[in-house]
């Protein structure tokens, strides 16, 4: 690798010096002055011998700096590579200055600042010219580079001053037509403060835009009328077309024919003329669509309306209607339908006679058998049976006391056989519940002597009675339970079937005591 000259080393940037130091094998993480010194010593070791008091900058530069500090008031710091690009440039726009201060600045103040800036630039130019005169001829390369940088800085300064002068002239000069200056226009306008809008006015404006209800209803009615009129027109047209088709298809003879009823069995058939009733002529055949549309659902096509809808409640006694066969009324007796769920037996109405049954006891009779109608009055049941004794008439039976209940043991059956023959008698036990009237339902007064004379239904207790609820039978049970828990606290005692059985017995005993206490009128705790 070729060794760079001293001027080249001084002209290199800091990053390039670091790369060079790395390639050579020197430490690159140093300051710019020290790094340049190390590189010079590495490439030119004789420079160290010639100038033993070399401190990171040449003696010539030190003397130059001393002379310049003596001659000038403001010292110029000489640095080789430490300056970054753009450090020396001043910003074109000063963002830190607030707008209010800029607005408050008058036109005269702007002109004074411009004059002071021009003086400063002239002073800098003079200093630079002096520096050129003082600088020795040995450092030509450095001065060339400095002069280049100074020329560029001069050009930048001139450009900035020209721009500022233009701005100042724009502000001072009267605004041209259509061009308002940047900040003068804002000064004239007051700052708009955020204020709440007047909602009342806004609502009124919206309400005025809205349509009134009357207008809306009129518009709606018109729309409905137009739609409904078109629909009605279509309906009328379809009806007319259907009627025309029917008139064309059906002849006059078919139209005048009567409609047959569904129940043709009850009414006589009219004489059929022409085609058979089973077949329909071709001109009468229509699709189901037209027939369903033309005929109403509620229209009843059959002329016959039956008066009797169910046969369960039909009157079968034709003799009442005709009023003939009155002498046969006793023979023709059809029983009226009664529900078997309710049975009312009064002392006036007696049960029915049993049919003659030899050597057989009757089975349990249903309630419907015992139902007696006032029309059909059976033979009376008598308490005793005696031959050739006159029977009691229904009138006499009615005269008997209502409070007395009949408890017959036997039933006499009147038969058509002669009287000299014996009649088979079957015992009958009356099990039906008689409805008690308010007269029979009256309770008599309690007779103490009669109740004491009656034998007891239970065996009375003999001896001294225990105090009620005072003694506890199962006192030791709780202690045992506690002892069990103490002994087996690691494994708790699980409830077994025996325990459940004992608990159940105890509950039953408690219920029994409670019922006995309530029956005897003792207050149960």
From Swiss-Prot:
Its main location: cytoplasm. GO terms for molecular function: DNA binding; microtubule binding. GO terms for biological process: establishment of mitotic spindle localization; meiotic cell cycle; mitotic chromosome condensation; mitotic cytokinesis. It comes from the Eukaryota. The keyword DNA-binding applies. Residues 93-102, 160-169, 495-514 have a biased composition (Basic and acidic residues). Keywords: Cell cycle, Cell division, Cytoplasm, Cytoskeleton, DNA-binding, Meiosis, Microtubule, Mitosis, Nucleus. Residues 58-69, 113-127, 270-285, 476-494 have a biased composition (Polar residues). GO terms for cellular component: cytoplasm; microtubule; mitotic spindle; nucleolus. Residues 43-203, 250-293, 373-398, 452-525 are annotated as: Disordered. Microtubule-associated protein with the capacity to bundle and stabilize microtubules. May associate with chromosomes and promote the organization of meiotic or mitotic spindle microtubules around them. Belongs to the NUSAP family. Interacts with DNA, microtubules, ipo7, kpna2 and kpnb1. Microtubule stabilization is inhibited by ipo7 and kpna2, while microtubule bundling is inhibited by kpnb1. Active GTP-bound ran causes dissociation of ipo7 and kpnb1. This is Nucleolar and spindle-associated protein 1-C. It comes from Xenopus laevis (African clawed frog).
